[in-house]
Swiss-Prot record:
NDH-1 shuttles electrons from NADH, via FMN and iron-sulfur (Fe-S) centers, to quinones in the respiratory chain. The immediate electron acceptor for the enzyme in this species is believed to be a menaquinone. Couples the redox reaction to proton translocation (for every two electrons transferred, four hydrogen ions are translocated across the cytoplasmic membrane), and thus conserves the redox energy in a proton gradient. Its main location: membrane. One of its GO terms (cellular component) is plasma membrane. The keyword Transmembrane applies. It is a multi-pass membrane protein. This is NADH-quinone oxidoreductase subunit K.
């Protein structure tokens, strides 16, 4: 049984992170930016799992930390979407360009 090399995991994580970074920097829709940030967090989680599984001293620390990070990311996404819904009700848009003032 052959295992996947560590370089494949790291390459996939780099590709996912770059796609998320590109989307977060270029898109103007706040929902898409939030999804791209979640994609970058998942790329970091993939690195944690890959290093904990394929490192010099394999242990479960990276995998447990990855689960903790996923729980925090889920809470962050829920709070972010709640803020976006409130902003949409206030301003009827979710574009980043129109959210530059703090006026209510």
């Amino acid at each position: 049984m052959s295992s996947v090399p560590a370089s494949a995991y790291l390459t996939l994580a780099i590709i996912l992170f770059c796609i998320g970074l590109f989307g977060a920097l270029t898109k103007r829709n706040t929902v898409i930016v939030l999804v791209c940030i979640e994609l970058m967090l998942n790329a970091a989680n993939l690195n944690l799992v890959a290093f904990s599984k394929l490192g010099l001293f394999p242990n479960l620390t990276g995998q447990i930390f990855s689960l903790f990070t996923m729980a925090v990311a889920a809470a962050e996404a829920a709070v972010g979407l709640a803020i976006l819904i409130a902003l949409y009700r206030n301003r009827t848009t979710v574009h980043v360009d129109e959210m530059d003032t703090l006026k209510g």
